[in-house]
Amino acid sequence: MGMRTVLTGLAGMLLGSMMPVQADMPRPTGLAADIRWTAYGVPHIRAKDERGLGYGIGYAYARDNACLLAEEIVTARGERARYFGSEGKSSAELDNLPSDIFYAWLNQPEALQAFWQAQTPAVRQLLEGYAAGFNRFLREADGKTTSCLGQPWLRAIATDDLLRLTRRLLVEGGVGQFADALVAAAPPGAEKVALSGEQAFQVAEQRRQRFRLERGSNAIAVGSERSADGKGMLLANPHFPWNGAMRFYQMHLTIPGRLDVMGASLPGLPVVNIGFSRHLAWTHTVDTSSHFTLYRLALDPKDPRRYLVDGRSLPLEEKSVAIEVRGADGKLSRVEHKVYQSIYGPLVVWPGKLDWNRSEAYALRDANLENTRVLQQWYSINQASDVADLRRRVEALQGIPWVNTLAADEQGNALYMNQSVVPYLKPELIPACAIPQLVAEGLPALQGQDSRCAWSRDPAAAQAGITPAAQLPVLLRRDFVQNSNDSAWLTNPASPLQGFSPLVSQEKPIGPRARYALSRLQGKQPLEAKTLEEMVTANHVFSADQVLPDLLRLCRDNQGEKSLARACAALAQWDRGANLDSGSGFVYFQRFMQRFAELDGAWKEPFDAQRPLDTPQGIALDRPQVATQVRQALADAAAEVEKSGIPDGARWGDLQVSTRGQERIAIPGGDGHFGVYNAIQSVRKGDHLEVVGGTSYIQLVTFPEEGPKARGLLAFSQSSDPRSPHYRDQTELFSRQQWQTLPFSDRQIDADPQLQRLSIRE
């Protein structure tokens, strides 16, 4: 596969491409920001211009998360193995070696330079200020809130590092899900990378399938016809990782007379990603659109390193990348690796599915690799005045990478937009170009040997090869719009969105979270803010409504079956919730549903496109074969739970926790697969389930006369550093489901009893 190792010696240990904290870096001047921190460490940053605003953002973020950002920059630079060795994983669960190779390829100098050149002056100034503010904090850091101080990877940062993080974010919906596959791509007969075993690719595929759940969301925008006060109302409930490069951070940004926006941002971004302003609130949910396509290459029979397009033989480009790996003796060795690229994009290999053999190979084209507008897009959204203005800004720039946008404004408008960067293929070409076998497995794959299957170009699109805004779903309503990571189809059942390219949106069964939301939103009764809040805090397991009555019937029919006794008793006592005091029946139910989902024909009422809100429903116990399979599924689930040692009287809050230091904080919520609106992802760790993702930043915004009223919290707290006073404070609030007022006006901010002020200049 073209990987080779070269010893670089002890000198390499001392040389780094990131400068140390104390390095004599050129420092910008004329920087100024005022920061006010309110309760729970939320910074309210005011500056006269973008450079000063970025300066304040970088400083405030470093105070809470310097170690997190520094490590994520190490990842985005492809330097994990240099500092941590080849063993270990990134926050995205990628092994260090393939992670480094992938990001060294993704963030090559020419790509960063092109990205920087495409930025507006305002965005450049935000980035320059951010880097300067972060570096200032590092120069002053005393270790009180920076536990990694003194580590060689905690370094001063440059604007290029922030671009690396941005590009990493961009490809989350595309080639980033294929990092292992890109690293493993090698011609037939070439040496294979040792880390590319079949098991590794099963894990990689599972990671890709989990993308929409772990980076999912719920969103509801209510308009004047349904809100109790006749104005707009928005619930933002994004489900994101609780650590790493996708960990949200609360902040409030102000440039007097030009900008006043509050919400949450991802690490390294000098903009608010989800938030609200004086007259507008917006949020995002991961969409179902395709943001990449695979291309099956017909290889030249004479040479598997060449491929055919319209009968012409073209050579694969070999792109060499190099990384450094720290050995057990502390010495660095240089590893070189070849990435193979076609006119469509890099080659990828998944054994048994996307193979590179003598006749064919697969390439991947990611639409967001050419999306240089993403930062400009969010900064533009931050300045939008109402729903109509936001829509114009999004449709003009087309810089949203892989999410839907939902918004509500003071005038009572509710908006849904499936406006993201999506490949464009003219409808008449899709039947001939698509590869049905892979499409059926959820992989948008096209024929690469026919140039007509290359992405179509429309002059109305903001980027060559993407779908123009006019051909993407938009719905403006005065009652409501909602989304929980389903397609655009049933955003509001009264106005189905249909007839779009299969790359954009398809009419497929909606998930249980959306069914739960729509069950609460149907009707004409006025909706109060409390109603939306309770949809989250109720922690109701919607799938139990569809399945549990029949499951308990099966229990009654098999009362003498010892293997089912404990499970049936727990299920009978369960409250159909994922609350802290919910019983162990929820554990049995989850394990059962994982097996039930694999059964064919087990639903009493299968999905019916004419009744999408009511189906599927029930278990077909009247069919003997189904009854037998379901009984076995429950018995297997019971055996798994009982083997884990969970006591009969265990509560959900005893099992699902977030560990902070030596203490465990009980966390409500559960797997969104089962219709828990407060979706929480947790993994087994010893005798408990440790939360790794799910509900993150919450905002519920209304628009009374005196200004926006927002309630919410940041579930995992502002700081990722154990030494910070804001490492666990909001997590405890989340455990108790105590949403807080988010202070927006100067009056609210200055009245906060925990107010702290700081002015920084240089």
From Swiss-Prot:
| Induction of the gene | Up-regulated under iron starvation conditions.
Q: Where in the cell is it found?
A: Periplasm
Q: Which domain of life is it from?
A: Bacteria
- Indicate the residues that form the catalytic site: S217
| Keyword Ubl conjugation included in the entry's annotation | no
Cite a single GO BP annotation.
single-species biofilm formation
Signal sequence region? 1-23
GO molecular function per UniProt: hydrolase activity, acting on carbon-nitrogen (but not peptide) bonds, in linear amides; identical protein binding; short-chain fatty acyl-CoA dehydrogenase activity
Q: What else is known?
A: A variable cleavage site between the alpha-subunit and the spacer peptide was observed: Ala-194 may be a part of the alpha-subunit or the spacer peptide. This step of the maturation process may not be very specific. AHL-mediated signaling mediates quorum sensing in many species of Proteobacteria, regulating hundreds of genes, including many that code for extracellular virulence factors.
Please give the family membership noted in the entry: Belongs to the peptidase S45 family.
Protein name in UniProt: Acyl-homoserine lactone acylase PvdQ
Question: What is the organism field in this record?
Answer: Pseudomonas aeruginosa (strain ATCC 15692 / DSM 22644 / CIP 104116 / JCM 14847 / LMG 12228 / 1C / PRS 101 / PAO1)
Taxonomy, top ranks, is:
Bacteria, Pseudomonadati, Pseudomonadota, Gammaproteobacteria, Pseudomonadales
